[in-house]
């Protein structure tokens, strides 16, 4: 008796990595693997890594160290390491963790099944890192994690040279997908019940400048056109995108957002610093006046838009005066929320070698002040919503609750997180359904709706979630000669264990 080999993917980092992991799942399941049950020891563990934070390598190698004795006691188990840290460290991974079987990079995720088979056959670690993109992620199958929301990549890579960021070195120059391929993937998700799609790119509003297809003409207005085209897809209720770059944010995108009903009134646009001097040192090709001007235009077109941002505190050379300028911009911008980061050196970036690194205790003190200011602003903005009605796409997982409330959670169209009490409906509310609720309480990072649910719309996404079904998208677009293999050799099942449980 034999059983299929099981797999587990552990993902670190950004939305790009989350989406890449969906592609890895699709590849592995097409090759005959099955997802390991929660808590079970998988035959294959894949790490999709991040290299952005300073301690990313410590986190990876610590986790690999914990797996070494597990693998030693489980014949046939394999470990693969991919993603940005693998692209950066290459042979270092196998040198530090010789029990790793496969190392692959950001440009060749489609080769993983082949590399796993080669490692099994040769009984030797396989390290394959390519310097340029082998295939768009869209040319690979994907096993989606959600029945109601999906990621769609519109580009890969980045042409910017921010001094704190290592991503362009690891993911390469920007390459854009054809609009028809993007829309075909969106349609494929909607056909399977997905209600919300997030368009992904390192810099989405430069889309159209670097099409991979030489027959596709360069088009600086392509992103606005893509947003409007998404508006024509029947059944697609919400469209989000991340992340735009302020230097290339154009009026036609604002107009498309305001005039296309299913584009969500939400904008996440990284600020990084409110000091023009620091922005110049970061090689961010905009200044605070331009940034605030974009926000002013967005709010004029969409008065209730939620605007969020990223801010780095303690960049090398940042003075107290520079930091005060950041606080001033935060006060003027009135962000709904902000992802704030204490600067940490990224090996391989120009900023890591800069003089005037800010002492840790100074960075921490500034960070605390920024957090306090932003929480004050967020709470004030959220309190203004008390008594208003919002539509929620119900999310998986329980909400902020106790035994009395039994709350569920959902996202409003503007992206705010709302915890609501689900009672009072004729049928049970499920993740993927849509409800309308009245806001009764506010906190800096979420809203509460404890009044009875006003409306409840059951959806195909809710049906799929209830049945435990998530979408699977087939390859879309032109492939680049990826090798294909069959299913891996099945594993013998241990006597008395019909489920393939781990030792």
From Swiss-Prot:
Residues where [4Fe-4S] cluster 2 binds: 158, 162, 165
Listed EC numbers: 2.8.4.3
Keywords, comma-separated and alphabetical: 4Fe-4S, Cytoplasm, Iron, Iron-sulfur, Metal-binding, S-adenosyl-L-methionine, Transferase, tRNA processing
Domain Radical SAM core: 144-380
Requisite cofactors: [4Fe-4S] cluster
InterPro entries noted in UniProt: Elp3/MiaA/NifB-like_rSAM, Methylthiotransferase, Methylthiotransferase_CS, Methylthiotransferase_N, Methylthiotransferase_N_sf, MiaB_methiolase, rSAM, rSAM_horseshoe
Intracellular or extracellular location(s): Cytoplasm
Cofactor descriptive note: Binds 2 [4Fe-4S] clusters. One cluster is coordinated with 3 cysteines and an exchangeable S-adenosyl-L-methionine.
Database matches in Pfam families: Radical_SAM, UPF0004
UniProt KW tRNA processing keyword: yes
Enzymatic reactions: N(6)-dimethylallyladenosine(37) in tRNA + (sulfur carrier)-SH + AH2 + 2 S-adenosyl-L-methionine = 2-methylsulfanyl-N(6)-dimethylallyladenosine(37) in tRNA + (sulfur carrier)-H + 5'-deoxyadenosine + L-methionine + A + S-adenosyl-L-homocysteine + 2 H(+)
Binding site for [4Fe-4S] cluster 1: 14, 50, 84
Highest taxon, organism lineage: Bacteria
Gene Ontology CC annotation, any one: cytosol
Class of this enzyme: transferase
Family: Belongs to the methylthiotransferase family. MiaB subfamily.
Quaternary structure note: Monomer.
PANTHER family xrefs: CDK5 REGULATORY SUBUNIT-ASSOCIATED PROTEIN 1, MITOCHONDRIAL TRNA METHYLTHIOTRANSFERASE CDK5RAP1
Function: Catalyzes the methylthiolation of N6-(dimethylallyl)adenosine (i(6)A), leading to the formation of 2-methylthio-N6-(dimethylallyl)adenosine (ms(2)i(6)A) at position 37 in tRNAs that read codons beginning with uridine.
Designated name of the protein: tRNA-2-methylthio-N(6)-dimethylallyladenosine synthase
Species of provenance: Nocardia farcinica (strain IFM 10152)
Source lineage: Bacteria, Bacillati, Actinomycetota, Actinomycetes, Mycobacteriales
């Amino acid at each position: 008796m034999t059983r299929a080999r099981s797999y587990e993917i552990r993902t670190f980092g950004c939305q790009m990595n989350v989406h890449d992991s969906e592609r890895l799942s699709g590849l592995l399941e097409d090759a005959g693997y099955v997802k390991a049950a929660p808590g079970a020891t998988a035959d294959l563990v894949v790490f999709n890594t991040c290299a952005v934070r300073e301690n990313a390598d410590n986190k990876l190698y610590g986790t690999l160290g914990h797996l070494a004795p597990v693998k030693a006691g489980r014949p046939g188990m394999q470990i693969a390491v991919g993603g940005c840290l693998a692209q950066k460290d290459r042979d270092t991974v196998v040198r530090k963790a010789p029990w790793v079987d496969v190392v692959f990079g950001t440009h060749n995720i489609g080769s993983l099944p082949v590399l796993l088979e080669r490692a099994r056959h040769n009984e030797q670690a396989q390290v394959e890192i390519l310097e340029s993109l082998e295939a768009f992620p869209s040319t690979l199958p994907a096993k989606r994690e959600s029945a109601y929301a999906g990621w769609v990549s519109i580009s890969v890579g980045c042409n910017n040279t921010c001094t704190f960021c290592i991503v362009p070195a690891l993911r390469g120059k920007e390459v854009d997908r054809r609009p028809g391929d993007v829309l075909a993937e969106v349609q494929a998700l909607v056909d399977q019940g997905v209600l919300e799609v997030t368009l992904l790119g390192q810099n989405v509003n430069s889309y159209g400048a670097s099409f991979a297809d030489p027959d596709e003409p360069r088009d600086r207005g392509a992103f606005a056109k893509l947003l409007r085209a998404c508006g024509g897809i029947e059944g697609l209720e919400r469209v989000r995108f991340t992340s735009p770059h302020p230097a290339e944010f154009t009026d036609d995108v604002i107009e498309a957002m305001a005039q296309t009903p299913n584009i969500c009134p939400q904008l996440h646009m990284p600020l990084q610093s409110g000091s023009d001097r620091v922005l110049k040192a970061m090689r961010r090709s905009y200044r605070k006046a331009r940034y605030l001007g974009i926000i002013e235009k967005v709010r004029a077109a969409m008065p209730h838009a939620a605007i969020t941002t990223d801010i780095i505190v303690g960049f090398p050379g940042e003075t107290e005066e520079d930091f005060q300028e950041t606080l001033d911009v935060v006060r003027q911008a009135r962000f709904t929320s902000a992802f704030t980061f204490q600067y940490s050196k990224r090996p391989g970036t120009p900023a890591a070698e800069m003089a005037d690194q800010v002492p840790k205790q100074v960075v921490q003190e500034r960070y605390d002040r920024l957090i306090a200011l932003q929480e004050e602003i967020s709470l004030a903005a959220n309190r203004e919503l008390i008594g208003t009605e919002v539509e929620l796409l119900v999310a998986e997982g329980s909400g902020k609750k106790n035994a009395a409330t039994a709350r569920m959670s959902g996202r409003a169209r503007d992206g705010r997180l709302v915890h609501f009490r689900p009672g009072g409906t004729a049928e049970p509310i499920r993740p993927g359904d849509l409800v309308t609720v009245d806001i009764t309480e506010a906190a800096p990072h979420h809203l509460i709706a404890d009044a009875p649910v006003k409306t409840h719309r059951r959806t195909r996404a809710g049906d799929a979630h209830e049945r435990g079904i998530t979408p699977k998208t087939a390859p879309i677009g032109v492939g680049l000669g990826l090798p294909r293999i069959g299913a891996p050799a099945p594993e013998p099942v241990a006597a008395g264990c019909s489920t393939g449980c781990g030792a």
